[in-house]
């Protein structure tokens, strides 16, 4: 298959008149300055976007949690109520619709941070991985790749209190129970199996290091000040420092959020992947993290829509810059190129897909066409489109060489109808 793009993001810049040749789902030729040829992709063509942090079932909360004042902790109770209702069939139905929404937004790969494992009282299903398999199948039907980040979740607090209520669905009893279940999961061409430490609240210190050898490995880090305070009270150090002592920080480890950090924490994270989720961090009143300081320390930034208050990686990308402006009262912290790299190449790398995220020969053929003629993007410099475009401007999406979104519609199913069905 051959595509032609008037504008395409190649080698960190906008190239003109680019012919893109694809064989067996990979780029075999990328030719800027080419004569017109192949199927035309309109607007600006980007590499596929990587959503590095997702909780698919949180999508059911969108627009339903704003009726009163509150905090992350009051929101969590509403989230637990949703978690208590799902089974493998309803989870598949919801996740398929959510991943379809991601495809419409130009996302070709998702990191699903998965901790909703068992039945309502904590009893495993006949297939102990039925919930995880539902997510993998949902991504396959939506046409996107998935890294299932199966989470260790053993305690309800840093003090080691047992799981209670709906949390019993999340736990496997101990590390060995979790490892036995996860080791039964199998990767496939469109799915990788990774690991997750839910947080220092949910994983005892002596277990942290036992998970460290698994990759990719993701974990929630210092999203709330209360987590830091509880960790210092229990262990005499910050969560970042505790994880460092336990050997968790490895090249393929990703810290998610990293909102409330000390200078020492930032230095430790300088060699890590860090996934930022600005729209969720705003929605839950988490705070503004030190994105520029982390990047300057050497952290490799990626992006996630997390709770799916919105599913729009353009909004996440510019949110990183705009939040820095609010915090510092200055402009110009991140270039468009840095933000697009976070949304593409480093996001894919954090999920274990090193052969995706850039338009280059040999890479997976993922393409996202973004309209430059909408009311949002008309007149913009293509190089700065990330500061204007939204998910609604995505017109075409190619994932592993297959067209999954054509003129704004999913080629496999009606996504709005699927969402209505899943959320009724």
Language-model-detected regions and their locations in the chain:
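Alpha-helical scaffold segments that flank or form the walls of functional sites
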Residues: 63-145, 176-188, 421-424
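His/Asp/Glu-enriched, well-ordered alpha-helical/loop segment
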Residues: 245-248, 252, 292-374, 388-390
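Histidine-centered catalytic micro-motifs
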Residues: 47-59, 216-223
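Histidine/acidic-residue-rich catalytic or RNA/ligand-binding cores of hydrolases
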Residues: 63, 225-237, 264-267, 285-294, ...
């Amino acid at each position: 298959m051959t595509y032609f793009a008037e504008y395409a993001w190649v080698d960190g810049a906008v190239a003109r008149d680019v012919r893109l040749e694809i064989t067996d789902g990979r780029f075999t030729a990328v030719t800027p300055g080419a004569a017109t040829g192949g199927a035309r992709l309109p607007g600006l063509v980007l590499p596929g976007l990587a959503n590095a942090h997702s909780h698919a079932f949180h999508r059911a909360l969108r627009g339903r949690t704003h009726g009163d004042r509150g905090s992350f902790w009051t929101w969590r109770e509403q989230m637990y109520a949703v978690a208590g209702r799902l089974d493998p069939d309803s989870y598949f139905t919801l996740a398929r619709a959510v991943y379809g929404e991601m495809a419409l937004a130009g996302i070709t790969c998702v990191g699903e941070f998965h901790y909703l494992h068992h039945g309502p009282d904590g009893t495993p299903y006949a297939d102990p991985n039925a919930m995880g398999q539902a997510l993998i199948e949902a991504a396959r039907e939506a046409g996107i790749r998935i890294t299932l980040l199966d989470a260790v979740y053993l305690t309800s607090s840093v003090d080691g209190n047992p799981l209670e209520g709906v949390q019993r669905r999340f736990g496997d009893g101990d590390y060995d129970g979790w490892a036995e279940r996860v080791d039964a999961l199998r990767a496939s061409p469109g799915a990788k199996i990774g690991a997750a430490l839910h947080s220092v609240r949910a994983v005892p210190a002596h277990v942290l290091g036992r998970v460290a050898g698994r990759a990719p490995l993701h974990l929630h880090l210092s999203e709330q000040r209360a987590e830091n305070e509880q960790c210092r009270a229990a262990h005499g150090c910050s969560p970042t420092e505790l994880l460092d002592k336990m050997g968790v920080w490895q090249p393929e480890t990703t810290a998610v959020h990293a909102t409330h950090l000390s200078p020492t924490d930032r230095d430790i994270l300088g060699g890590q992947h860090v996934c930022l989720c600005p729209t969720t961090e705003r929605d839950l009143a988490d705070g503004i993290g030190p994105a520029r300081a982390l990047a300057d320390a050497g952290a490799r930034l990626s992006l996630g829509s997390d709770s799916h208050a919105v599913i729009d990686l353009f909004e996440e990308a510019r949110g990183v810059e705009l939040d820095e402006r609010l915090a510092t009262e200055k402009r110009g912290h991140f270039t468009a190129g840095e933000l697009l790299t976070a949304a593409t190449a480093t996001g894919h790398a954090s999920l274990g897909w090193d052969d995706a995220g850039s338009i280059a020969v040999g890479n997976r053929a993922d393409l996202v066409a973004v309209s430059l003629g909408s009311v949002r993007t008309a007149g913009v410099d293509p190089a700065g489109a990330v500061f204007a475009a939204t998910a609604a401007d995505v017109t075409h999406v190619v994932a592993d060489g297959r067209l999954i979104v054509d003129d704004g519609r999913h080629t496999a199913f009606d996504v709005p109808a699927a969402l209505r069905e899943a959320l009724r």
